[in-house]
Amino acid sequence: MSCFSHVMNPITGENSWQEREDDYDYHQEVANAGFGDMLHDWERNQKYFAALRKTIKGMRAAGREVHVLDIGTGTGILSMMALKAGADSVTACEAFLPMANCAAKIFTDNGVGDKVQLIRKRSTDIKIGADLDMPQRANLLVAELLDTELIGEGAISIYNHAHAELLTDDALCIPARARCYAQVAQSPLASQWNSLKILPSLDGEALLRPPEQLKSCKGEAALHDVQLSQLPAGTFRLLTEPIEIFQLDFQRKEKREKQREKLVQLQASQPGAAELVFYWWDIQLDDQGEILLSCAPYWAHPELNELSASKEERVPVANVVPWRDHWMQAIYYVPKPPQLATAGQDFYLSCHHDEYSLWFDAMLEAPAKTVRRHTCSCDLHMTYSRSRIGQLNQAIRNKRYLRYLEATIVPKQSNVLVLGNGCMLGLASAALGAASVQLHEPHRFSRRLIDSIVQHNELKNVKYVENVEQLEDTELIALSHVFAEPYFLNAILPWDNFYFGTLLMKLKDKLPEKVEISPCEARIFALPVEFLDLHKIRAPVGSCEGFDLRLFDEMVERSAEQAVSLVEAQPLWEYPSRALAEPQQLLSVDFANFNVEHHLQGSIELTQSGVCNGIALWVDWHLDKTNNPKSIVSTGPSEAVVPGEFVKWDMFVRQGVHFPRKPTDLSGRVAWSTDFKPLLGQLNFGFSQEKR
C-alpha cells in the first residue's frame, strides 16, 4: 500500500506530493542505520571477540557462571560471539524493532535461536525478576554504545542504569574503560571552517570586512567530526603532544559523572596560534587493558609502525590505520585562540563534558571561574554548515568569481540581482561600485547576517528581495547582471543548486536581452573510482567472524532500493579514491534556456585495473562563455585527474557518489544515462558496468 508525502524539491524550490510506500520511513531508517559500516570494521570485531574469549575464560577459571547482557545488539554479532566464547546465558536487547526482528532471524540462521533471549526494548526499560524481562542480573555486559564523541549516544546514563538495575556488583564490562585525548593544533586551512575572513579584491585590497559581531563571536562548541588522518600533512601544525583528558570507567559500580571539567597546563612544542583541539578516544576492551582499540589519527596511533610494515604499497601512510566511519575524530574550535610566541611557553587547556558532549577552551592564564559552553552570537555558525563557512573563505574559488565581477561590473552603472543564500561574492559587486545590488535572501538569519556585513562596510544601494516574482518590471528591465555562486541552504547534492535556473526562468521574459547571466552554464561530470574504504558503508557484509549475516544484507538491500537515492552526497576529500578513467561529462545546462529537457546516454572506458566500487559526480560552474579554466568553479577535483592516481577533492563541498550494487574488477566500461526534466525538478542518473 502506498501513501503521499509532502517533499521539498530543491531544484524547483516547491513542496510537492510524492507517492511512497507506507513503510518508506522504516526502509529509510534501516538503510541509513549504519550497522554495515561497523560490521566491516575488522579490528573492532576481532578485538571484541578476543576480549569476550579472554574475559569468559577468566570468569570460568574463577569458578563463576557467565551471564551476558548485550545492550544494543544490532545484528546480534556480539551475542553470538559471547555464546561461542562459552557464556552460560545471553540476553540481548535492541529497541530498534526492524533490527531486533532481523537479529532474531540471524540467531535462528546461525543455530542459536533458542540460546539467546532477545528483548525488544531499551535497556533502561528492562525489569529484573520472575516472569519479567530478565530472571536475574547479568555479570558480564558487552555493548557498543559509543560515537565519535564517545558519550553522544547516551553511554553515561545507560551504563549508570545498567549497574544500578541490571548487573551484579562484581560484573565485568566489555569494553572496560575509555580514555579521551586532546591535541592542540594550528591550521589556517581548518580554521576556515569556523570563521569568516576578509574578502580581498584581486589586488589584495579589502572588499568586505567581517563586522565586529562576527569577530567577537565564540562560535559553536559542537564537534566537527572528520577523518582527521585525511587532513593534508602540510596544512596543520601540532603545538602539543596528545594528552589524556578524561577516563570513563565502564566497570565501576559507582555512577559515572554526567559533568566534569579539567584544567590542563601545557607547554607549546613550537610557536603558533592554539586554534584547534583535535580529539579522539581509545577503549580498553578487557579488564587488564591488554586489548586496546584506538581511534587516533595515524600520526598518534599506537600501532602505526606495525601497521605500516604490513601495508600494501599503494596505500598511503594516512590509511594504514583501521578505517571506520562510525567512530571518527573531531575538531573543536577554540573561541579566542591564544598566540604562543615561543616553544616551551605555558598555556592552559580547559576541558569539559556534560552527559552527551564535550567542549574546550585555551588561554594563557588559568581562568578564575568555570568556562561556560560557548554558543554562536553572530548568525554565521547557526545558519551555515562548516563546509559552507569554509567555502566562503576559499581563496582560489573567490578569485575566480571576483575575476568575473571585476571585469564586468561598471561602477555607478551596473545593476545587479544576486540569487542565492549568503552570497558574499554577489555583495562584493556593491563594494566594486555597482549602481544597485538586490539580494535574494528569503532566509531570515542569512539575511540578518548579510545585513550586518552591509552595515559594517557602509555599502550603499543594497536591497533585499524575499520573492523574485515581487520585483517590478522597471527594476528587471534595468538589470545588467544576474549573478549567483550558486548556493542555496536546501541544497544537499551539488546540482540541487540548479534552483538558480528555476528562479531565472521566473524572470526570463522580463529581463533585458543583453543581461549578463553568471554562471551561464553548468556541467555535470562523472568519474569511476576505486575507494579504499568508503564503499563499505553500502557493501554487503556476508559473514563476520564466522557468523552468517546474509539476512542482514538482504534486509538492508531491500530498504536501500526503496529509500536510498542512487546518488548520495559525501565529502570525498575524507575518503581516498583512485581514478579508473578520465572524467566524462554527463550533462550540460544552459541557464538562459534552463527549461530544456535532456535525455542522454553514453559510456566511460575504464583505462585502469581495479574494482570500480564508486562513481563520483560533481558540477562545474561556468561563469562566462570563454571556457577559460580561470572562469570555471568546480565542485569536484581540486587538481587535474590522473587515471591510476588518487584524486584530490575540493574540501569545502560534498560531491555526489553512486555505489554500484555489485562492483566488478573486470576491465570494461561504465554505461550511463542522464534524464533531466527541469520543470519537474527531476534529475536522474543510471549506471551499469559492462565487459568489453
Swiss-Prot record:
InterPro entries: Arg_MeTrfase (IPR025799), MeTrfase_PRMT7 (IPR014644), PRMT_dom (IPR055135), SAM-dependent_MTases_sf (IPR029063)
This protein's UniProt keywords: Methyltransferase, Repeat, S-adenosyl-L-methionine, Transferase
Annotated ranges, domain SAM-dependent MTase PRMT-type: 14-359, 368-692
Gene3D superfamilies: Hnrnp arginine n-methyltransferase1, Vaccinia Virus protein VP39
Pfam families: PrmA, PRMT_C
EC number: 2.1.1.-
Keyword Magnesium tagged: no
Enzyme class per UniProt: transferase
MF GO annotations: histone methyltransferase activity; protein-arginine omega-N symmetric methyltransferase activity
GO biological process: peptidyl-arginine methylation
Domain of life: Eukaryota
Record function comment: Essential arginine methyltransferase that can both catalyze the formation of omega-N monomethylarginine (MMA) and symmetrical dimethylarginine (sDMA). Specifically mediates the symmetrical dimethylation of arginine residues in the small nuclear ribonucleoproteins SmD1 and SmD3.
Protein family: Belongs to the class I-like SAM-binding methyltransferase superfamily. Protein arginine N-methyltransferase family. PRMT7 subfamily.
Protein name, UniProt field: Protein arginine N-methyltransferase 7
